Each structure stands twice: as C-alpha cells, then as structure tokens.
Amino acid sequence: MSEVHVYPVNQEIAATAHVNDEQYREMYQQSVINPEGFWREHGQIVDWIKPFTKVKHTSFDTGHVSVKWFEDGTLNVSANCIDRHLATRGDQPAIIWEGDDPTDDATFTYNELHEQVCKFSNALKSQGVRKGDVVCLYMPMVAEAAIAMLACTRIGAVHTIVFGGFSPEALAGRIVDSNAKLVITADEGVRAGRAVPLKKNVDDALANKNVTSIEKVIVLKRTGGNVEWHSERDVWWHEATAVASSHCEPEEMNAEDPLFILYTSGSTGKPKGVLHTTGGYLVYATMTFKYVFDYQEGDVYWCTADVGWITGHSYLVYGPLANGATTVLFEGVPNYPSTSRMSEVVDKHNVSILYTAPTAIRALMAKGTEAIKGTSRSSLRIMGSVGEPINPEAWEWYHHTIGDSRCPIVDTWWQTETGGILITPLPGATALKPGSATRPFFGVQPAIVDNMGNILEGVAEGNLVMVDSWPGQMRTLWGDHERFEQTYFSTFQGMYFTGDGARRDEDGYYWITGRVDDVLNISGHRMGTAEIESALVAFDKIAEAAIVGVPHDIKGQAIYAYITLNDGEIPSAELHKEVKDWVRKEIGPIATPDFLHWTDALPKTRSGKIMRRILRKIATGDTGSLGDTSTLADPSVVDKLIAEKQTIL
C-alpha cells in the first residue's frame, strides 16, 4: 500500500475540544470494561421524567437476541429537543431552513419551534392519531418535516419516513409493512428547480389494493401546484394547525417504546423495517453529536442529508436539537443553481460544522475550484463525511479546497441499524488518515473476523462485527424478529454482523473496504440487489436478472444489470429505455440501472446459484483471474459474457 499521509490533531481545535487523545483512551477503556457504569453516567445527557435504574440488558445469543437499555426509565424526545432549551435559549435559532432557491430561507427559534410542534401535535390528535400509532412521512426537505417528526414523538406516535425520491410502489410497500394510519406529505417538493409530485405519488400509492390502513392524509402547501383532492381523506396542514392549540403536554414514554421505523435495503428482497426505540437511541444520538462534531455553544451546524435517511434522523434533527444546537435544513442540492452553492450556504449562514457525503464531494471535486468560487468558508471549523467510505483523493480535496487545509475531517462509519456513529475520529483527539474511519466511539466494540468467525488480532482484514451492544442499536425488524436474528446474528454466532468488510492497521485504525453481502451503496444510499432484481423480473419481457455494483467516480457505485429476456424478445434501444423506466417506476430513480447487459444465460453453479463473484469481475473488466470456476454448470457462459461486455450500452 502506498504511503499514508497522517494529519496530526489540530492544536487550536484541541485546546477547546471536549476530549483530547489521553481522555479518549481513558473514557474508551472505561466504556468497554464497565459499560454499565459508563452509560449510567452518560445516560444523564438527556432529561428523564422517571430516572432509569437499569442500564444494560442485552444478549447476542442465537435464539435469544435482545437489546434493552435504560428499560425502566421514561422520557420524551420532543421535550428533550425543545422544551428543555426554552428557559436558556428560547430565542436562539433552532432550525435555519435554506430553500432550493437561494433567495428562499426561514429561521425558527426554539420558542417558535415549540409553538409549531405543539400545534401540529394537536392537529395529529384531531385526526385520530394516538400513542403507538404509526405515521408515515413522505415529505420534501422543509422545516415542517422536522416539525412533523417532533410532533409524532411528542404524542408518542411512531414515525416512518419514506425518502421523497421513492416511487409510489415503494411507498405503498412500506405503508403496508408498517400498517401506518396516516400519511403526511406536501403538494409538491422542489429539487434543483424541478417540482416533485409528492401528493400525486401518495395518491397512487394509496390506490394500491394492498394499502388499507391509511385513514387520513395531511398535505402541506409547498408550491401551490394543482393536486387531486379527496375531501373525505385529505386535510390541509395549514387548516389543521390554524384551529389547533399551541399547548401540548409531552407524552411520557418508556425508554423501550418504539420511536421510529426506517426501511433499509436488504440483501434478500423486501426492505427491512429497522426499529429504534426512545431512550437508548436519544442518548446515543445526543452523545455522538456532541463528541464527534465537538459541538460548542454558538456553532451553526449543517448536515446535508435528507430526513428520509438515518443521517437526517440522527444528525439533522434529533442529535443537534437535543444538544440545543442551530441546525441548517437544506431543500436543494449542493451544486444548484451553481457549483459553488454549498460554499455559498456555508458563508450565508456562518456554518461552522459541515457534514456531507462523499458523493457530493466527488461531484464538486470534478468541477475543481468552481466549487468555492467567490466564497471564503472562513466560518468552518469541523467537517464530516458520511454514507460510504471516502476515497483518499476526495478526502484530500475536501480538506484542502473546501476546508482550506484548516478543518479536521470526521470520516464517520455507521448504519441505519446502528442508530448513530460507531467508528470515527474525534476532532481534538484523533490524528487523521485520509480514507480511514479511525477508531471506535465510546462503548463500541468492533472486531474483525475471518469467514469462519474467528476473531483476528492486530493488523488484519476480514468481516467487521460488533461483539457487544451500544445504546443506539436497533431493537428488531418491525414485525419480524426472526429475520432480525437471521440477518444480523446468524452469520457469526454471538456477534452483530455489519455486512461490511474492514481492515485494521498497525495503529488500530479501521478502514472500511465495502459491503461483503449483496447490498449496493449508490451515492451513500443502500440498495439491495435483490430488490432491484425483483423489480426487473416483474417486467413482462424479462426472464432473469442479476445486479452487481461497479465503481463510479461520482456515485461510488453504479448499477450494472445482467438481463436474460424471454424467448422471442430482442434487445433494442426502445427496450433499453422501457426497462430503465420500469425500475424507476417500481423503486425510484436511485435504483435505475446504469448499464444493461443483455445475455442468454448467467453463470450458475450446478445447484442453480448465480455466481455473482464472476459477474462482478466481468462487469469491472477484471477477467484476468476469475478464481475457482469448477462449480459452474456451463463454463462457456463466462466466455460469452466477456465477449458481450464489449457492446454494453
């Protein structure tokens, strides 16, 4: 491996940071030797209605997997994110909304946020929503998305947010699985100057015969665009809140009461409803936000993630607001209307902490200094990366160009399932290596195991697992605990399997090497290959399909589809477009294949299993050593695929 450049800890940052290297090591040791004592102390980072006496009650044992933290305590998330700040910072901005159009913005103080959340909480109650009911959000990136989330938590409803880029079919599937009672949406969203037909998509989803649980749809007027109206079902947000009281007492919730369901892509078809509960999740999101971003009084924090992803939950809304921070919520994209938009927003709002994705960084990097044209970015103090491993070249560009070589970069590794950041540098404590997520956060116990599950010590490469629980860990898959155990705990007994590969270097730093299961990472969004394959095979002209990921300069991975057509069907430019449009409709634009490879046959073992390893190598042009092909039923298929590869559209 080439020489790795090490960036020492920035001493100016270290002087005021919450922890230095020595303190990190000491706290980390405490957290793994005595997790009970450590989390008893740090569980106090949030306000409890009824204090907990029990801290950790967890098991990774096969057949008995159970995760419970602070299980006899009670609290309310909304009260922790808003009410507890009113006496000390009521007039401080809580949310700064920056519209898609650079002239569009709005600020909500903690007092104003409190009023809006209480009103919308009462509006939800007036539409029949009660504690424990599931509410589905399909929203644009507007402040009302955060208000709706906080209102759900205030009254004890469970929210499930579906990213606004998902299709009506994908939305319907998630509504059915979660048994949601009400949908919150907008007439339209706005993204890069284009309208997104959210209400129409909801109407289409609810027309699906399998969707039977939805009673009401609350619609926010974002653009004023024309929408179909179902008067017995649809309610305008502004009308529902106009008559609502601005007082709403927060519901007392048990630490293990469900907080939200968030669907993530599985390697076996149907998306999985990851369940996070109230106490452990909030403690972990609050604590990681404070330490990972070294949050200090007066910081303005901007996370560019959509609320529809876990990063938007933990580090756009809950983590920042629980810490009393000012969080920027951005409707647009980092390169619209110009390549320098991200830098312009930093200057406009004096952003001091920026958290974005390698995809955005690579897209801006391709434009060189255009990304910083006419901006100073002098307010920046800390920068972060999330969503996928960042390649060293992009890390260096982000550091030198966006951050003027001044700002530490926290390259964070975590998942929807983990609730919060697991492996990360801390700004005042960790020397940085571009491309490495570095060291585990407090209480996090990673290990690297070989394919037999043997723990590898020292410098090693293999499968990344966690050997013990942490408060932010998911509790189960909604309605399917068996699948939860099967997915995460059956591969390596007694350990949580992340699905990622990693290597550990001589300094104990972790480097994430990518997925080892059949899940793609497209622009930081996880997509199951099986979900895309299922959509393709549902197309009436396709007999069989296999999906692999190939490297992509901007998106990290592109989608490469091998397709076998039904007898009598002939590949054509028209069919090529039909297939892409079909996947876009079934799942959403993000799942659209970048490459279609028409073929008569796929490489299969004698037992009928598709050999994806070989398909990956062919797709990436790495055909020099295909490894063991002795189990192939028909080895000639491989040569044919290699020849066909030359003509891929």
UniProtKB/Swiss-Prot annotation:
The modification N6-acetyllysine is found at residue 609. Its EC number is 6.2.1.1. One of its GO terms (molecular function) is ATP binding. ATP binds at residues 387-389, 411-416, 500, 515, 526. CoA binds at residues 191-194, 311, 335, 523, 584. InterPro entries: Ac_CoA_lig, ACAS_N, AMP-bd_C, AMP-bd_C_sf, AMP-binding_CS, AMP-dep_synth/lig_dom, ANL_N_sf. The keyword ATP-binding applies. It catalyses: acetate + ATP + CoA = acetyl-CoA + AMP + diphosphate. One of its GO terms (biological process) is acetyl-CoA biosynthetic process from acetate. Mg(2+) binds at residues 537, 539, 542. The keyword Disulfide bond does not apply. Keywords: Acetylation, ATP-binding, Ligase, Magnesium, Metal-binding, Nucleotide-binding. One of its GO terms (cellular component) is cytosol. Pfam families: ACAS_N (PF16177), AMP-binding (PF00501), AMP-binding_C (PF13193). Its cofactor is Mg(2+). Signal peptide: none annotated. Catalyzes the conversion of acetate into acetyl-CoA (AcCoA), an essential intermediate at the junction of anabolic and catabolic pathways. AcsA undergoes a two-step reaction. In the first half reaction, AcsA combines acetate with ATP to form acetyl-adenylate (AcAMP) intermediate. In the second half reaction, it can then transfer the acetyl group from AcAMP to the sulfhydryl group of CoA, forming the product AcCoA. Belongs to the ATP-dependent AMP-binding enzyme family. This is Acetyl-coenzyme A synthetase.
